[in-house]
């Protein structure tokens, strides 16, 4: 079932990218 695999892949990517974006925004604000 590729739909479930792509769904979990999307969740994994989102959970990895979101914190990175938040850290990047915090670093930009500190500058």
Curated annotation (Swiss-Prot):
Domain of life: Eukaryota
Subunit structure, interactors included: The 4 large subunits of the cytochrome b6-f complex are cytochrome b6, subunit IV (17 kDa polypeptide, PetD), cytochrome f and the Rieske protein, while the 4 small subunits are PetG, PetL, PetM and PetN. The complex functions as a dimer.
Topology class, membrane: Single-pass membrane protein
A cellular component annotation (GO) from this entry: cytochrome b6f complex
Gene: petL
TM stretches of this protein: 4-26
Compartments where located: Plastid, Chloroplast thylakoid membrane
Role of this protein: Component of the cytochrome b6-f complex, which mediates electron transfer between photosystem II (PSII) and photosystem I (PSI), cyclic electron flow around PSI, and state transitions. PetL is important for photoautotrophic growth as well as for electron transfer efficiency and stability of the cytochrome b6-f complex.
Family label: Belongs to the PetL family.
Protein name according to UniProt: Cytochrome b6-f complex subunit 6
Organism (species): Calycanthus floridus var. glaucus
HAMAP family referenced in this protein's UniProt entry, alphabetically: Cytb6_f_PetL
UniProtKB keywords: Chloroplast, Electron transport, Membrane, Photosynthesis, Plastid, Thylakoid, Transmembrane, Transmembrane helix, Transport
InterPro entries documented for this protein: Cyt_b6/f_cplx_su6 (IPR007802)
Gene Ontology annotations of biological process type: photosynthesis
Single annotated GO MF: electron transporter, transferring electrons within cytochrome b6/f complex of photosystem II activity
């Amino acid at each position: 079932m590729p739909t479930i695999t792509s769904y979990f892949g999307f969740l994994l990517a989102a959970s990895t990218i979101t914190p990175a974006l938040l850290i990047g925004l915090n670093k930009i604000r500190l500058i």
